[in-house]
Amino acid sequence: MKRHAILATIGSLVLAALTIHPAAAAQSPPAAPSLDFEYFKTRVQPIFAAKRPGHARCISCHIAGTPLRLQPFSSGGTTWNDDESRKNFEAMRRVVAPGNLKSRLLVHPLAEQAGGDFYHNGGKHWSSQNDPEWQILKAWVLGETKSGSE
């Protein structure tokens, strides 16, 4: 009987809280943005093949021997086909938390003084969050789409 009384009291308290603040019960956290494949394919993915002074291309290391694996170019190719792009997109989804600017894709290759972390054996490719390539990655993580909307 005592247990029943405790449960009834708890139920009454919950009901009272919902009555006092009904909007709080209906609110849920905002949904995280989704990652757009077309934006990835046309804006993000080319960054992985770009040459930067003093650094190897991302694809040089990330096709083998690292936890984050990109697809190699087809023999003689200089870019990825749709199937390879889809596989790269899926690999990148493992290092991106949509909507989170602390995603590994953003902080590992970013200089520590610019907000990056100490990880990334391939060096710090961007010294500032204002770098145009870093801004493209950020836009994608925040839900930018090829059509330009979020």
Give the ranges of each region predicted by the language model.
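Positively charged n-region of N-terminal signal peptides that target proteins for export
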Residues: 1-4
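Bacterial N-terminal signal peptides
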Residues: 8-19
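Aromatic- and Gly/Pro-enriched helix-to-coil junctions and flexible linker segments
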Residues: 23-150
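General helical structural elements
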Residues: 6-7, 142
